[in-house]
Amino acid sequence: MFYSMMVWMFWRKGNDKLSRLIMLLMVVLDLECLKDLALYLSDFELHKSMWHWVNATDMVVVPVYTFVLMELVKPGWLSWRKAALHEASFLMPLVLYGITDKLFWFDVLTAWCFAYGTVTYFLMFYLISRYHRQLKERFSYQDNINLNWLRGILSCFFVILLVWVFSCYMVDAQFDNIYMLFSLGA
């Protein structure tokens, strides 16, 4: 429900790229929640292979988080080509895992997700510092220029990513609950 309201709010907000990216992020998260809800409500027995498939499909959202963060600190960076390339790097192992049902492709996708998230984390700290300097150089009144909130959000995203990567391999309801608590608490 929350994600659906966010989609509606950012759809009404405007046509700027950042609002549309946040709306896209909320749409993807909303669809993932609906998928999970359908699985939880059904009498379907979630075996390990299906658990991996459910988690693998959730990984396509990781680049969208990066797109939002990049648009915040480097407006205009994202193009359709860059978006397609970043998403393709997640979709290819997902498709190969779906076709072959080999756990190797799930491991590749999870490792890529972790590596991509880690590189994004450190790159964002650099870009946030650079953007902070640019803002201070551009404006004479500097008292209200503070991007520490963005560093905090970035760190929360990274912690959630770490817990989520571990939860991909832990087929356990309790560990899934821990991930949900981290997501809600951050």
Report the location of each language-model feature.
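Phosphate/oxyanion-binding loops and surfaces in catalytic or ligand/nucleic-acid-binding neighborhoods
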Residues: 91-98, 118-121
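Juxtamembrane "helix-exit" motif on the non-cytosolic side of transmembrane helices
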Residues: 34-45, 95-105, 164-174
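Alpha-helical transmembrane segments of multi-pass integral membrane proteins
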Residues: 12-34, 86-87, 109-185
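N-terminal low-complexity or simple alpha-helical regulatory segments
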Residues: 1-93, 107
